[in-house]
């Protein structure tokens, strides 16, 4: 696994900070600066010092680049995406994930309509009229999936999370509301069923804490990914679109760590909600639901 500091140098450029300034302010050695420039490993102490200086997280300045493993699902999805193979795993997953993830959130499009939109890039409505938002969010979800595949091996960070939300909600009626903040954290309180979520003013701090806690784990397991999802949903960082953004994140992290991903279909929706609610008391509810979804 190789390390890349491309994102660090992008931040420095945006902040108009030169390498020599960084070296001087943090008292870095020339050898350390050279390692950063050549994408070589540096100490965690150095990374923390840089993050504190730039007010960011480790995932904001570095990413791990995996060697290509042609036996993984991710490699196959990337190849099928590139080749635009009809009927492939990539093709079917695009349709099933978009349909089911949107359906959980109230979309009234059928799976056949979702398939038609994906395969023809047109809208085929024979009976009932469809919501423009349902159509836009379906199209946007296809783009979210492509973005997720392209970024799957990157370290999970705030940029990926916010960009996913921005893609999902672009050109929807929500995006035209001045307070909605597409691709940014919420500005108004929201709720999940009867549960209070994190107040807008505390979202940034709680998301930073969640990401740092998650990225600090030595080996990411299936339960770690589920735990992140539960905590993400409880924070509910965006005004709307949290569930779909959260499920894209889960799919990404499963691909990154070569864990078989899953799609929550309608018959498992209530079990999924129960699992989210009862995670602190019984992790088996959500774990078993997701494992069942994986086998369907």
Specify the residue positions occupied by each region the protein language model found.
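FIC/Doc superfamily catalytic core
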Residues: 65-296
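A short, Lys/Arg-rich alpha-helix, primarily the initiator
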Residues: 1-21
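DNA major-groove recognition helix of helix-turn-helix/homeodomain DNA-binding modules
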Residues: 45-60
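Recognition helix of helix-turn-helix/homeodomain-like DNA-binding domains
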Residues: 27-42
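Alpha-helical residues within the helix-turn-helix
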Residues: 13, 24, 52
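Key DNA-contact positions within bacterial/archaeal DNA-binding proteins
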Residues: 20, 31, 59
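DNA major-groove recognition helix of helix-turn-helix
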Residues: 26, 37, 54, 62-65
